[in-house]
Amino acid sequence: MKKKKILILGGGISREREISLQTAKTVYKELKKKNYKVIISEPDENLINIIKNFKPNVVFNALHGQFGEDGYIQSVLVTQKVKYTHSGVLASFKAMDKEISKKIYIKNKILTPKHIKFIYENSNKIDKKIIKKIKKKLKFPVVIKPINEGSSVNVYICNLKNFLKNLKKLNFYKEILIEEFIGGREIQV
């Protein structure tokens, strides 16, 4: 019987690159134990040639964050007619965008913290107007996070005192989600 060939995508260009590389190495090690023919590749300009030459039975997507979990790499794999793990293009896109996800939750009557979206137009002009807007709709403490990032990258729980300082740390993102903080035990799946 022919060994199944699995191409693992790892690394990438997101802020979660190191996490992705760790995931790819772990998956590689476990699949090798099961006697699969496995290679790891970056999702770079050589990817399509690697797919054509290696001819994987399936691509294991170990990419994290932007370009890995947001539907981008999934669309590349679809155009190459390659089977891959994890969700499809549209589901990945919707799940990665926290604002779209929240709209889906609200539409389906799933409880979710109140929120507002903050758009960085000029990082030098962050002022106390945003605090007034938050106080109108939300209560402190709040959670601030990039709309399109995963693995809890750049997530801050803020009180009134440290809010502006933490918001300025996220000035390289265009869109920020600001949610009411809900205390309790945190569980990861």
PLM region descriptions:
Residues 105-106, 134-155, 173-183:
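ATP-grasp fold ATP-binding core
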Residues 1-90, 94-96, 100, 119-129:
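ATP-binding N-terminal substructure of ATP-dependent carboxylate-amine bond-forming enzymes
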Residues 159-189:
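Phosphate-binding site of ATP-dependent enzymes
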Residues 104-112:
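Basic phosphate/pyrophosphate-binding loop/patch that engages nucleotide-derived ligands
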Residues 118, 155-160:
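Short beta-strand-to-turn element immediately C-terminal to the catalytic PLP-Schiff-base lysine
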